[in-house]
């Protein structure tokens, strides 16, 4: 009998330890904002782990990574039809790194680079038909330059107050 108990402990203990190392995954509805920091409802402790949101039809809407109550890591969203909507990296609650977004038909909608929550570098956007709409450069959140196209892919001149003569 002692052999059976020892065997049960040796098999069960590693499974329990693995389970303890996993981060919590909660529904976004279980989080609430406390002075700029997200916590589990009824708690003042900043949340660390993952959360998700669903559409009314049960389709996944988003998945968020949290660290100390702020978005941190990859955030992913989906359109209601199941097509991926966007991927953005966050650091300390601010976009940081590359963001890619897609129209609900799967065509790329935008691609941008962020640093400390501000657009920084190249940003490109596309029409739903796949034609390029805008390609521009940003520095510290300010547009430096941009070019525009119409839905047929022809260049257009739009007033751009960032240009100086």
What are these regions (language model features)?
Residues 16-165:
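Glycine/tyrosine- and acidic-biased, solvent-exposed loop/turn segments at the edges of beta-strands
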Residues 8-16:
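Bacterial N-terminal signal peptides
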Residues 1-8:
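Bacterial N-terminal signal peptides that target proteins for export
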